[in-house]
Swiss-Prot record:
SUPFAM superfamilies: Nucleic acid-binding proteins (SSF50249). It holds the Pfam family eIF-1a. It comes from Marinobacter nauticus (strain ATCC 700491 / DSM 11845 / VT8) (Marinobacter aquaeolei). Keywords: Cytoplasm, Initiation factor, Protein biosynthesis, RNA-binding, rRNA-binding. HAMAP family: IF_1. This is Translation initiation factor IF-1. GO terms for molecular function: ribosome binding; rRNA binding; translation initiation factor activity. It is found in: Cytoplasm. Belongs to the IF-1 family. It comes from the Bacteria.
């Protein structure tokens, strides 16, 4: 997937799901299911409910995404 095809949005973690999946409420009110990116998983970045995150979405499926950044 090319970087230019990605839609990047801010959101808040609402719920933790099994297998490192999270339910994220985006700034526009939509709720998506997102998983942690490989670099965050490799560096053991912990994500908890209530954390502000940056999510990448593809234009093909706007209900799933990838968490690429956790704000402090």
């Amino acid at each position: 997937m090319a970087k230019s095809d990605v839609i990047e949005m801010e959101g808040v973690i609402v719920d933790t799901l099994p297998n490192t999946m999270f339910r994220v409420e985006l700034s526009n009110g939509h709720v998506v299911t997102a998983h942690i990116s490989g670099k965050m998983r490799k560096n053991y970045i912990r994500i908890l409910t209530g954390d502000k995150v940056k999510v990448e979405l593809t234009p093909y499926d706007l209900s799933k995404g990838r968490i690429v950044y956790r704000a402090r």
